[in-house]
Amino acid sequence: MKQSLEDTLLAAIRTIPDYPRPGILFRDITTLLGDARAFRRAVDELVHPYAGAKIDKIAGIEARGFILGGAIAHQLSSGFIPIRKKGKLPHETVRVAYSLEYGLDEMEMHIDAVSPGEKVILVDDLIATGGTAEAAVRLLRQMGAEIVAACFVIDLPDLGGRAKLEAEGVDVRTLVSFEGH
């Protein structure tokens, strides 16, 4: 009997209690990435709605968004944009500041990574509060990109990130949800 996509993914995602600090349940997709069947099913499911669409670029958020985004870009025959923390890219960059729980951080991409009007899908492994994804959307829009969607394997709906992105007019696609944090 074929296992459902949700069951396959939930079985492949490891939960680590009290990481990176007490009270947090860390959802680790490295086990999913190591499971060839689960990894393929996740990527195929994220790609499916956009197959045949003209998607110019996939933007992946450091670091797990690079892995998923690279696979998605390959399947859609799209270019790939790495979005990284400040100071990690070698060429001239454009950056945006965003709030973290305990302060500010900055993310950036190369200034020539996207052209105005290009259709872009944003990819990361998980959406929690949405702060990082929202900053990435602002960064891409600042350069004139049209955000087609933001795709994540995991949604933590209790933390409100999906709703935050949808309020910004972003179509959000997730594959599985975990209650709590």
Curated annotation (Swiss-Prot):
Keywords (A to Z) from UniProt: Cytoplasm, Glycosyltransferase, Purine salvage, Transferase
Highest taxon above the source species: Bacteria
Gene Ontology terms for molecular function: adenine phosphoribosyltransferase activity
EC numbers for this chain: 2.4.2.7
Subcellular location: Cytoplasm
InterPro entries registered for this protein in UniProt: Ade_phspho_trans (IPR005764), Adenine_PRTase (IPR050120), PRibTrfase_dom (IPR000836), PRTase-like (IPR029057)
One cellular component term from this protein's GO annotations in UniProt: cytoplasm
Pathway noted in the entry: Purine metabolism; AMP biosynthesis via salvage pathway; AMP from adenine: step 1/1
A biological-process GO annotation: purine ribonucleoside salvage
Annotated catalysed reactions: AMP + diphosphate = 5-phospho-alpha-D-ribose 1-diphosphate + adenine
Family, similarity comment: Belongs to the purine/pyrimidine phosphoribosyltransferase family.
Subunit structure: Homodimer.
NCBIfam families referenced in this protein's UniProt entry, alphabetically: apt, PRK02304.1-3, PRK02304.1-5
Entries under HAMAP family matching the protein: Aden_phosphoribosyltr (MF_00004)
Function description: Catalyzes a salvage reaction resulting in the formation of AMP, that is energically less costly than de novo synthesis.
Protein name: Adenine phosphoribosyltransferase
Organism, scientific name: Chelativorans sp. (strain BNC1)
Gene: apt
